[in-house]
Regions:
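A conserved regulatory-domain signal marking ACT and ACT-like small-molecule sensing domains
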Residues: 1-105
């Protein structure tokens, strides 16, 4: 029975539209934890995460691959309110950061 439930979940996930959120954030310990925790508390799964330091390590660029669901707009508004989030940009699912990484999977 569990096997069928797993297959159904994968099918639902596969049918969902994906998108990429590009965040510019302050670079210090705990920032990624705060952002991931916000998604987790709202039962929102992050399908992919890439984070690299920029501007001499003072800030970081973070890309989050997520399912485009109705509640995403509300989650984005809450992410924007975090003090360490300096900017956020939405991209469609074909963003090169994740399409390039798919070659390694």
């Amino acid at each position: 029975m569990q096997k069928n439930a797993d297959v159904e979940r994968r099918q639902v996930r596969a049918g969902s539209a994906m998108m990429v959120l590009e965040l510019t954030v302050n670079n210090h310990p705990g920032v990624m934890s705060h952002i991931c925790g916000l998604f987790s508390r709202r039962a929102y799964n992050l399908e992919g995460i890439v984070c690299v330091p920029i501007t001499n390590g003072e800030t970081s660029r973070m890309w989050l691959q997520v399912n485009e669901e109705q509640k995403l707009d509300q989650v984005i508004k809450q992410v924007q309110k975090l003090p360490d989030v300096l900017g956020i940009v939405r991209h469609d699912a074909g963003h090169e950061i994740f399409t390039g990484l798919s070659a390694f999977v």
